A protein has these predicted regions:
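Repeat-blade elements of multi-bladed beta-propeller folds
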Residues: 32-36, 71-99, 113-140, 157
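Solenoidal tandem-repeat scaffolds enriched in leucines and small polar residues
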Residues: 153, 157-159
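A short beta-strand motif characteristic of beta-propeller blades
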Residues: 57, 66-71, 108-113, 151
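N-terminal secretory signal peptides that target proteins for export/translocation
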Residues: 1-7
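Short loop/turn segments that connect beta-strands within beta-propeller blades
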Residues: 103-106, 143-146
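Boundary at the C-terminal end of the N-terminal hydrophobic targeting segment
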Residues: 24-30
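Blade/loop signatures of beta-propeller domains
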Residues: 30-64
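Bacterial N-terminal signal peptides
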Residues: 8-24
Length: 159
């Protein structure tokens, strides 16, 4: 099965699951538990930022690996899309096939988990779990604090 068809199947299966998880959680205004903040993809928050922001830490990330490098119209996975809940930043990677958790205050690595294919979209954090899909056709859930696997679902054929 081509990667485009596998990706479409995974997206169709994953969307209702992620929306149901997101609708069941209660997040503070400071949290950013999914891509563009909330189920409505508003990209806004009521959280007030301090007037004098300062860089606390930074990380050099691997250059993302595009899904279709020959098609200039498809650039959705060229930029990492972090999500933040509490003191943890979660970041998916197409280059390392992983989701990594960092402490937001120190930048220290908390944990890193791997899938069997690139992870092209931001994970979702809900009910103490980090949920993400991979090009391997699977949807994964790991414990948000430890990164330990909670469940794995084969949502689309692997090839």
């Amino acid at each position: 099965m081509t990667s485009v068809i596998r990706f479409a199947l995974l997206s169709l299966c994953l969307s209702p699951l992620l929306l149901s998880l997101l609708g069941s959680q209660t997040a503070s205004a400071a949290d950013w538990p999914t891509w563009r903040h909330d189920a409505g993809r508003s990209g806004t928050t009521t959280e007030t930022l301090p007037e004098n922001l300062k860089l606390a830490w930074s990380r050099q990330l691997a250059t993302p690996q595009p899904a279709w490098p020959e098609d200039p119209r498809i650039g959705f996975d060229l930029v990492p899309e972090p999500v933040v809940v509490g003191r943890t930043l979660y970041l998916a990677s197409t280059r390392t096939d992983s989701v990594t958790a960092y402490d937001t205050r120190t930048g220290q690595l908390k944990w890193k988990v791997f899938a069997d294919g690139p992870i092209r979209f931001a994970p979702l954090v809900a009910d103490g779990k980090v949920v993400f899909g991979s090009d391997d056709g699977c949807v994964y859930a790991v414990d948000a604090q430890t990164g330990k696997p909670v469940w794995k679902f084969q949502a689309a054929p692997s090839s």
